[in-house]
């Protein structure tokens, strides 16, 4: 079996284990992976995988602290394109608003700021997960909205 195939199997098993929401320690995750035939797994590797996939400790239905993957948060990985961080794009008569995954607004705002007036952007303000974009006098909000949607492959 190729190394990349082994890695894919490991990642799939790791994510499946975390979906069970019953493992409270990294040691328990190591044991579960070893039980599935991943003999070369250790706590250090599990720790790196938890970080890479954005795993967090939270309480499960039994009120136990367990590791899980916060899929609904849209946590980016090291290979995620920026467009995956954009959750929603909307506008009114004055602004275009982008809602992102937690913590992603600053990165996307920086990209938009770099495009600047040539793309019809007068200014950008970003919080943690929300971005306000103001169009220039020569660009309508609707045009800017369409441009932003195209940039991030966002469809309404």
From Swiss-Prot:
Its main location: cytoplasm. Pathway: Amino-acid biosynthesis; L-arginine biosynthesis [regulation]. It is found in: Cytoplasm. GO terms for molecular function: arginine binding; DNA binding; DNA-binding transcription factor activity. GO terms for biological process: L-arginine biosynthetic process; protein complex oligomerization; regulation of arginine biosynthetic process. InterPro entries: Arg_repress (IPR001669), Arg_repress_C (IPR020899), Arg_repress_C_sf (IPR036251), Arg_repress_DNA-bd (IPR020900), WH-like_DNA-bd_sf (IPR036388), WH_DNA-bd_sf (IPR036390). It comes from the Bacteria. Pfam families: Arg_repressor (PF01316), Arg_repressor_C (PF02863). Keywords: Amino-acid biosynthesis, Arginine biosynthesis, Cytoplasm, DNA-binding, Repressor, Transcription, Transcription regulation. GO terms for cellular component: cytoplasm. HAMAP family: Arg_repressor. Regulates arginine biosynthesis genes. Belongs to the ArgR family. This is Arginine repressor. The lineage of its organism: Bacteria, Pseudomonadati, Pseudomonadota, Gammaproteobacteria, Vibrionales. The gene is argR.
